[in-house]
Swiss-Prot record:
Role, per record: Polycomb group (PcG) protein that binds to the Polycomb response elements (PREs) found in the regulatory regions of many genes. PcG proteins act by forming multiprotein complexes, which are required to maintain the transcriptionally repressive state of homeotic genes throughout development. PcG proteins are not required to initiate repression, but to maintain it during later stages of development. They probably act via the methylation of histones, rendering chromatin heritably changed in its expressibility.
Keywords: Chromatin regulator, DNA-binding, Metal-binding, Nucleus, Repeat, Repressor, Transcription, Transcription regulation, Zinc, Zinc-finger
Bias (Low complexity): 381-394, 1038-1050
Residues spanning the signal sequence: none
Name under which the protein is recorded: Polycomb protein Sfmbt
Gene3D superfamilies named among the record's database cross-references: 2.30.30.140, 3.30.60.160, Transcription Factor, Ets-1
Gene designation per UniProt: Sfmbt
Pfam families registered for this protein in UniProt: MBT (PF02820), SAM_1 (PF00536), zf-FCS_1 (PF21319)
Residue numbers binding Zn(2+): C340, C343, C360, C364
SUPFAM superfamilies xref list: SAM/Pointed domain, Tudor/PWWP/MBT
Biased composition (Polar residues): 267-278, 494-509, 1117-1128, 1158-1167
Length: 1274
């Protein structure tokens, strides 16, 4: 196979060419040279970034790896004091060069953190000496102990462990082994560490003399202190310096981070002196920590996550692999895989951070926004850095005065407008429009004192507060409790020797309250809870899919969709519904195993004094606890708690707005009210419920969120795709998604208003570019064809509204055929058995007519006469579950439909193959893996009628043969059964229709069948009725009838119109009904017993019926009675349908003549003549010719009668007043009709289509020509 034939943009996410092909092959594939991977990797130290997978990036794949290299030469030392929330960035910027250099694996762990450049080009990174070399100071034993005290200050016990909110020690944060294939991190910290980890608001500057100076960094930020242990360890201090910040210091930088620089780091002796000047109790505090150091290091080892070592798999974090790994070897399903946009790590999407699951860790999420804003503010930060550096040359005793200078500079810097902050953040969001970090309202960023008033510190007060903050810092470092730091005078240090802080400072410090947590410059995105949790008051659960928008189905007096109600059958003992888990595509299938009998829920209480009339948008106010007794499909039988009998048991859909998990009422402030019948049964209902609910199970708190997510379609309105042409099944046609109901799509063809319904997982829809890729016939606009043909030489130009391959479900991957070199084992001329796509109730011998690419092939059903044009071919994939080896039917006792010219009683494959000289396809070519689907004979379900796919009907599993199901439509003969695969997207659990808001067609009534027995028409052989499979829908009223017009008997069977679908209600003349009568019961109770119908006066409400739903999309749940008059019926045509037409009915003939129906002659002809006035939905062309249909001889009254018998009674008078006779009627166009009807588009389209049908009945050749013109393709 020539690789250049597969330049498809929509295939890019399916394979990883870079890891399976040589560079020469990649060059041939992409038609241009690619990046040399080995050359780039060998020279990676010369580049800050490297594209690890350039070919995938060129093709458009999702897996991009990035690597960052460590700078070999570092400029003089520069240090950044950063927020503890940004600790991943701090790990790179804070000076831990020894860990990074000694452990080579850490380079990959921190590859996403490149050097941050300031305005002058100076690199901000690891601390260095003035000569640009890494600093490696030594220290004495005491200094080393002091450093380890901070690093390993863990408690021996593990009882106080709790999830980390802010990580403090970098040693505890990440440890990489030498094999670079595992990750060591500390997932918990003790409560004492957490106290120290509270964010603060101070920064630290290094001074040339080795001294240190405290600088104000901003609210909720931390102080970076060198440990002086020779390893360049640093420590972030706790929330003890927060009160020392002036009012608006934080405004000088977006995140309050102060950029400070220094010459030489403080020596260990100076650090020791600095500690001793503040406290004499250091030794005891530090020595006690030495013993726990080794113990806690051992404990951290026991908490290490041990990954499974596989060849070629290298972990980046505990939940993600490195980005330069071939995704095909990673043991993660493609639909559950995600790639970190920050570092390129690949992992499970559910474990990623942010709502859109775009980062592998919170560090990547925070670091991205941090770096974006920091780069924008670098110029301002550089100015602040130089100011801080100029003020950091005085020795340690002048710390107070120096701090005051820094404070004044910071105050001056904070005078910039607040709009600068908003502008910077806004610019960051513009550059990364997909980032969804929440920014706190700037108006709330105001520091308050203990009295709730804005703080205004300045002059000496600020100096005293800074000095007090310094004392508190030293106290915290020496082991003093954070709470003790607030004590006056020497008590804060524990020894009483400190006299540097006067009482005024203490009092000033006590008057300032710490900055509230809410006063942060931004908030992080909350990670999703891994396990279902009971919702808390401050975070209510998301509403269920129909929450507060759906009427109570148990008390609904009027159902606008007139759907079939399962309730009468649910109460039968022998009723068996297929479980929801049998339908992989059904909403909630993945969480349905969590539900079970005995589970407690809160449901609406309908047994109360005042039954509420719930309107859309309202929620019931009365609820009570109930127990699930039985589950059938989406329906559940429940009993209120407190009833001892089943007298008040009720059925309810588990996925509607009435059912909630226990505790939902408490979160909404709704009381639990016991049913009125038993309200006096117990004195204390609270104790009763406590006893019943103790140890009971309830719905997961995220149950409705899961249901809602599974209801979301992958498609959107306006997308273009390629789908089977229902008028010519051997070609695909460009169509547009115009409606979506429960993941079912209504596709409208590009050149007509016609279309059909199908599920988004259906195999008859394909992505843009599919036809030109596999070699299938395509009907599309000229510009589309040119774009697709151009894509065969280069990549397809993808438009915004193109449906790409990731939206479609397939049971194979293109990798198998392109990368692995797999070929199609089928060859032309092979014989097999297949489900007839035009008659799903039969399995027939078939012939492979053409072999396409990627496993597709065109087959022809041998039961029909051959069509030289090939219009009867149909495309199947070699892995399709609807094709079988020769002899499959006989081996499974299935009646096979014989080939054309053979008798079903004498047909054998041996004779057939010998007569045709063909070869049967080998059995190993078929994929007949049978999953544990769970279907059994007799199970009830809801199934789409694929002969008219806009209808979803009540059905039963009649037979199970491996993975093949024979679905029987209840109330209809076996002639209308369908053979479907167990994983077909056209079958649904009981209750699916009401869940998604789709109409459910029920079985016909016996009484209604008995009515429909006027003189029968000649029966057409079965095989001539199978054109119904051309995906005919209840589509556009204006054009569908012309597609389905019955031709004469001389036409070849494969070109006849489509057969009748059983699930459409048949209408009599009496159709002008008020909306409240539009239901099945009305028709059943008001049907004349003799089958005749009398004329009825024009009804004023008929206008509304004719106006409604004139767009012709065939949506059965929204259409009205008038649409039934526009869709037609003959012995081989589909009957019109609508919500006003009741559930179902058998075919009936209301057009009457003396030879067809004697009693109805008065309805269909003039009272003064014997002219034949037909009801077009009930005759075919041969009958019209036999009855001498002559509309050009009609008078005005005959035209009025024609409109009346064809369900347009409301406009009879209009045509009569306009003196429209037969000749004038045949000359009318849509533009002529609209002014007559008051510019009503819907009725005009309906009557225009009636006229077109009438012309076709008069001239059958015109009908064939009309249909041929509609089916033309490029």
């Amino acid at each position: 196979m020539n690789p250049t034939e597969l330049h498809m943009m929509w295939m890019s996410s399916q394979y990883n060419a870079a890891n399976n092909m040589t560079l020469e092959d990649a060059t041939a594939l992409l038609n241009h040279p690619t990046v040399g991977l080995l050359e780039e990797m060998s020279g990676h130290h010369h580049q800050p970034t490297l594209e690890m997978n350039p070919m995938m990036g060129l093709v458009g794949g999702d897996f991009n790896g990035h690597a960052a290299t460590l700078s070999g030469t570092l400029p003089p030392g520069t240090l950044i004091a950063t927020n503890s929330n940004n600790l991943y960035s701090f790990a790179h910027l804070g000076g831990l060069q020894h860990q990074l250099l000694q452990q080579s694996a850490a380079v990959a762990a921190f590859q996403n953190y490149t050097e941050v450049m300031d305005a002058d080009g100076m690199t901000v990174g690891l601390a260095t000496d003035p000569h640009g070399e890494l600093m490696d100071e030594t220290c004495d034993d005491e200094d080393q102990v002091y450093g380890h005290q901070i690093d390993d200050g863990y408690d021996d016990g593990g009882a106080g462990l709790e999830p980390k909110q802010e990580i403090i020690n970098i040693d505890d944060f990440v440890m990489m082994n030498e094999d670079n294939n595992s990750y060591d991190g500390t997932d918990f910290m003790t409560s004492s560490d957490k106290d120290i980890s509270q964010s603060s608001s101070s920064g630290l500057t290094h001074m040339q003399g080795g001294g240190v100076s405290l600088g104000v960094a901003g609210a909720e930020h931390d102080l970076l202190v060198p440990l002086g242990d020779g390893l360049m360890h640093h420590k972030l201090l706790g929330a003890t310096l927060a009160p020392a910040m002036p009012l608006n210091v934080g405004n000088s930088n977006v995140f309050g981070n102060i950029m400070v620089t220094g010459a030489d780091p403080p020596s260990s002796k100076q650090m020791k002196g600095y500690r001793n000047s503040n406290s004499s109790g250091t030794s005891s505090a530090t020595v006690t920590t030495v013993a726990s150091t080794a113990v806690m290091r051992a404990q951290r080892k026991t908490r290490k996550i041990e990954p499974v070592n596989r060849p070629g798999l290298v972990l980046k974090t505990p939940i993600a692999y490195k980005g330069n790994i071939d995704p095909s070897v990673i043991p993660i399903q493609k639909d559950g895989m995600a790639v970190c946009e920050r570092c390129g790590a690949i992992g499970v999407k559910h474990t990623f951070y942010t709502k859109s699951r775009r980062f592998c860790s919170m560090a990547c999420a925070r670091g991205e926004l941090y770096s974006l804003v920091l780069n924008n503010k670098m110029e301002t930060t550089g100015a602040t850095t130089s100011n801080n550096q100029s003020t950091s040359s005085s020795p340690l005793p002048a710390a107070s005065g120096t701090s005051l200078d820094v404070t004044e500079d910071a105050l001056l810097a904070s005078d910039q407008p607040q709009s600068d902050i908003e502008l910077d953040l806004h610019a960051a969001h513009i550059k990364n429009a997909n980032y969804r970090f929440r920014i706190t309202d700037q108006s709330k960023i105001t520091q308050l004192n203990s009295f709730g008033e804005p703080m205004s510190l300045g002059g000496d007060a600020a100096a005293h507060n800074v000095q007090m903050a310094a004392d508190e810092t030293i106290a915290a470092l020496n082991g003093a409790a954070v709470g003790d730091a607030a004590a006056p005078g020497g008590e804060a240090n524990g020894s009483g020797n400190d006299t540097s802080t006067p009482n005024t400072a203490s009092s000033g410090y006590l008057s300032a309250a710490p900055t509230p947590k809410a006063l942060r410059l931004f908030k992080d995105v909350y990670p999703q809870d891994d396990l279902p949790q009971i919702p808390k008051y401050e975070r209510l659960p998301a509403p269920c899919p129909q929450m507060e928008k759906v009427l109570s189905i148990r008390r609904r007096m009027y159902d606008p969709t007139h759907s079939y109600d399962w309730l009468p059958r649910l109460n039968k003992e022998n009723f068996n519904a297929a479980p929801v888990t049998c339908f992989p595509h059904a909403p909630g299938c993945e969480v349905w195993d969590n539900l079970g009998v005995g589970m407690k829920v809160e449901v609406e209480n309908t047994d109360c004094d005042n039954i509420e009339i719930i309107q859309p948008g309202q929620t019931p106010t009365s609820f009570w606890v109930a127990t699930i007794l039985e589950i059938k499909g989406y329906k559940a039988l429940m009993s209120y708690e407190g009833f001892d009998t089943d007298s008040h048991d009720f059925w309810v859909n588990l996925c509607n707005a009435e059912v909630h998990s226990v505790g939902w009422c408490a979160t909404r402030g709704k009381p639990l009210i016991p049913p009125r019948t038993i309200e006096h049964k117990y004195k204390d209902w609270k104790d009763f419920l406590v006893g019943r609910l103790s140890g009971a199970r309830t719905l997961p708190s995220n149950f409705y969120n899961k249901i809602n997510d599974s209801l979301q379609s992958r498609f959107r309105l306006g997308l273009n795709l390629e789908c089977v042409d229902k008028d010519r099944i051997s070609q695909v046609r460009l169509a547009t998604v115009t409606k979506i109901v429960g993941k079912r799509l209504f596709l409208r063809y590009f050149d007509t208003d016609d279309g059909f319904w199908c599920h988004e997982d259906s195999p008859i829809i394909h992505p843009v570019g599919w036809a030109t890729t596999v070699g299938h016939n395509l009907a599309a606009p000229q510009d589309y064809l040119e774009r697709m043909l151009a894509g065969r030489e280069a990549m397809i130009e993808v438009h915004e509204d193109d449906a790409t391959i990731e939206l479609f479900k397939m049971n194979f991957t293109f990798d198998e055929y392109f990368l692995d070199g797999k070929t199609n084992g089928f060859i032309e001329g092979m014989k097999l058995e297949a489900v007839d796509p035009l008659n799903l109730s039969s399995i027939c011998p078939a012939t492979v007519m053409a072999v396409l690419k990627f496993g597709y092939m065109m087959i022809r059903i041998d039961s029909y006469q051959p069509d030289e044009s090939g219009s009867d071919w149909f495309c199947y994939h070699e892995k399709s579950p609807c094709i079988f080896p020769a002899g499959f039917c006989s081996a499974n006792n299935i009646s096979v439909t014989p080939p054309n010219g053979y008798d079903s009683r004498t047909f054998t494959w041996e004779v057939y193959l010998r007569n045709t000289g063909a070869v049967a396809a080998n059995q190993h070519l078929f994929h007949r893996v049978v999953p544990e689907h769970g279907f059994e004979t007799g199970m009830s379900l809801e199934c789409a009628d694929l002969m008219d796919p806009r209808l979803v009907c009540v059905a039963t599993v009649a037979r199970v043969v491996g993975r093949l199901l024979k679905v029987h439509f209840d109330g209809w003969t076996d002639e209308y059964d369908q053979w479907l695969d167990c994983e077909s997207a056209d079958i649904y659990p009981v209750g699916w229709c009401i869940l998604v808001g789709h109409k459910l067609e029920g079985p016909p009534r016996v009484s209604y069948q008995q009515v429909a027995k006027p003189a029968p028409k000649p029966k057409v052989p079965r095989k001539k009725k199978t054109k119904k499979g051309a995906s005919t829908t209840g589509g556009g009223a204006a054009k569908q009838q012309n597609d389905n017009t019955q031709t004469t008997q001389t036409v070849k069977p494969r070109t006849i119109a489509l057969k009748t679908t059983p699930h459409l209600p048949k209408l009599s003349i009496k159709l002008e009904l008020k909306p409240e009568h539009h239901n099945a019961a009305f028709y059943e109770n008001n049907q004349p017993e003799d089958g005749d119908g009398d004329e009825e006066d024009p009804d004023p409400d008929a206008d509304a019926d004719l106006d409604a739903d004139a767009d012709g999309d065939g949506d059965g749940s929204t259409s009205h009675i008038s649409e039934q008059s526009t869709t037609h019926s003959s012995s081989d045509q589909i009957l019109g349908s609508g919500s006003g037409g009741g559930s179902t009915s058998a075919p009936v003939v209301t057009a009457a003549t003396g030879s067809i129906g004697g009693n109805s002659n008065k309805m269909n002809s003039s009272a003064t003549s014997s002219k034949y006035i037909p009801r077009l939905a009930d005759i075919d062309a041969s009958e019209a010719a036999h009855l001498e249909l002559q509309p050009d001889s009609w008078n005005v009254y005959d035209v009025s009668q024609f409109l009346r018998v064809n369900d347009c009674t409301a406009y009879c008078d209009t045509f009569s007043r306009s003196k429209i006779d037969g000749k004038r009627l045949l000359q009318l166009t849509k533009d002529d009709i609209m002014p007559l009807l008051g510019m009503k588009v819907g009725p005009a389209l309906i009557i225009s289509d009636l006229i077109t049908q009438l012309k076709c009945k008069v001239n059958p050749g015109r009908a064939r020509s009309h249909k041929t013109n509609k089916s033309s393709y490029l």
